[in-house]
Design a protein with these regions (language model features):
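Conserved beta-strand in the GNAT
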Residues: 59, 66-77
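Conserved acyl-donor/pantetheine-binding loop and adjacent beta-alpha core of acyl/acetyltransferases
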Residues: 72-106
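Conserved GNAT acetyl-CoA-binding A-motif
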Residues: 121-132
Length: 170
């Protein structure tokens, strides 16, 4: 990981760079056995604008002031998490969800950085990923998440669901 990565809210003028990052991420996923998680146009322009307008979209900036990654951190209920199959959530406490995390592949440790950022604000973090996304599944588990079960996306696709509960400070 670079020495001085910075996280800031995404601005509308960042969208062209985000589209490049998502294209790179889709190629990476396909080359690593996960060609189906993100459609060629995912996320849509409308989704990107909604994430920005809701204040949920963030970018990671490198020392050279380049956007190297992006993620969504949404606080509050995610409707797709209301029903979980083959398991259960660790608790019913308020949570934030990490979605659409992607990088340009040039900087390591982006997932850990996004999680640390999220944990500065929230004690409960949920995330989900496609069964075939082995790279993300490994990153999730290596960073202390617990596997909780299966959720269904708005389109009916299954996702593996995880939760991280921050330990209280003693």
């Amino acid at each position: 990981m670079e020495e001085n990565l910075e996280i800031r809210k995404t601005r509308k003028e960042d969208i062209p760079q985000l589209k490049q990052i998502f294209a790179t991420a889709r190629q990476f996923m396909a080359s690593n056995g996960n060609p189906d998680q993100w459609a060629p146009t995912y996320p849509s322009d409308e989704q990107l604008h909604n994430d920005i307008n809701n204040g949920d979209s963030f970018v990671v900036i490198s020392d050279s002031r380049q956007i190297v990654a992006t993620f969504v951190l949404h606080a509050g209920i995610d409707p797709t998490y209301n029903t979980i199959y083959e398991g259960q959530w660790l608790n019913d406490a308020p949570y934030a969800t990490i979605h659409r995390i992607a990088s340009n592949g040039q900087v390591k440790g982006i997932f850990r950085l996004a999680l640390q950022f999220a944990l500065n604000c929230y004690d409960n973090i949920r995330i989900d990923t496609h069964h075939d996304n082995i790279v993300m599944r490994n990153a999730i588990m290596q960073n202390g998440f617990s596997y909780c079960g299966i959720i269904h996306c708005w389109n009916g696709d299954e996702r593996m669901a995880y939760q991280y509960v921050k330990e209280p400070d003693v």
